[in-house]
């Protein structure tokens, strides 16, 4: 059924192209009849149909219709609508409407003590919203979306990201530096099934196509819903069921749309500390339908004040007796720490509604948004036949400028950044940057590094990396080669190969620190927190989606491990101090077969190349499991063991934007494990913490081959202080989190016998408890943690949780 659905889509598109010669383009403009000023976003509709569009910011509009006779209606709040009858035998370029303004009346309302007349209007609007929602069983609508990126200078990009220049005066004009356009079909079926299909997309030459996925379906907001998600927070809409308890309303004025009286009502949260909307909503008298919103996010919804403004504009019209959105406009301006100024505009028009028609359940699968494989191949004839928002002169000039800049040959120095981790030679090949050419350890001493990386080759199917390193103290040359090839329409299967002969970090899976931090700590304090061993071998693995919620994998690995030793005593300071010994490992050759699975119930976005999982900010749970098998006889391995691992991650929305994160890990070993293959409880260095680690444990302090760990973090954000209405604190966006960790660890007797070192374990549960304090815009938080048992000399710690390290 799914294949037949997409076949139907293809046939529909083909039919559209074939009938293109019969279509006629209508261009026009809507202005104020008295002043000649454009009426931005005016509503255009073909009489007695479900077809229409909305003007751009300059009042310009486009319609594509078949040859025939039509009545075109232009309307705008505060103006009398105008209707023009046309016969479309050829293209029309000047179908201009000059609307006559109606009277704007300031309210002369008798206000009884304690009675706000706006509240009764809102109460009836909420009732109207709920009755209208009960009528909507399903819908299909087409959407055209245009996104505009504005920066102080032209942006750069590769296949995975966009780069924005830093600096510029606050008075520097923002220029259009990127444009995205797409055409989509969007489906809804009660109670909460959504699907969007991008049929065609195009963008300026400096924008990667897979970024162009914002369209008119679930990813956009509908102010007829109860809650709207902005910047990670669920905000009550102006007509939500609890809006009367959350917002303050005031009638600002009344206007007319033809003979229909329209109330212009000002809205803001009752408490300025509550996140929400401020601005104007427009509600029709007698019918009490919400017909337009023009709102901005208040300061409480704008965490850290990163955004100068977030302005949302949306209009509604009646289709089959139901009010539905006909456009969506989002205008964002941001000034990031005074370093980066950026603007973003999103303009969407929705047209050709089909209401309450039968929709197959096969449409609504795990892919909430799908980009059709040929969406990037549509030529100019397709776009001529598709309703769009006409380009302004500024947008057309930007397209021309950007395309000419992208034709300039690639310049190495244009992409060189001293502090980056890589230097792009072209869009797919990069090499190590100066920052990545050196590292230091007590085993290797001064080391030179070089890497070459290939990304997204062969239509984004092939990735590879070759890392080379030489240590001047251990006098060893190391190599690490990885390659992966992706299969399937959405690259859901991968064949991976890794060949290595390198120095490995001991218990590296439990070490979340960067190499730069390790180098600096070692050179400055001589207290290197890492240990090492040599390993060489290879690994081969195949993994992929067996079902949309199930990924499986299997592979084989071969490795030979040997101990490493301290080979230098160099340091910038503390030259008389000796480095600690590097612990020896169990020398061994281990061959393993592994099988595993991942279960992920989240929906995903098919961006034309990949499936990107998303929970849309909602709760979710993930599971994964692996089995590793080693045998002396069957695999010629030095040790016999079977390792069973299980992991789970749970994310639960609790109070508004607050959330609970739960991570569970368990490992059981049947057999004998080499010391270097034990699982070390993730610890930390003195004052720099990582999330989902044991803050009061040192790195590699406790380990085992039978493990159970539980990490719980409740991120209250600033919701707790808002809920408690704590004076002052509630207005400063103080982020609070509660942290609890628990662990069990043990060793098999056979593992103890071959271990070259004593291994600390927790045969009874180890507990620690603490909290973190941060501020919304600051990229780190201070955490305070206490041991609840196994108390020794390190029972309390304070540290910075800094993800950047």
Question: What kind of region is each of these model predictions?
Answer:
Residues 103, 108, 112-262, 268-276, ...:
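Structured extracytoplasmic
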Residues 49-60:
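Short, acidic Ser/Thr/Gly-rich low-complexity loop/linker segments typical of extracellular
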Residues 87-113:
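Extracellular beta-sheet/turn segments enriched in Thr/Pro/Gly and aliphatic residues
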Residues 235, 368-470, 474-805:
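Exposed, low-structure sequence patches enriched in small/polar residues
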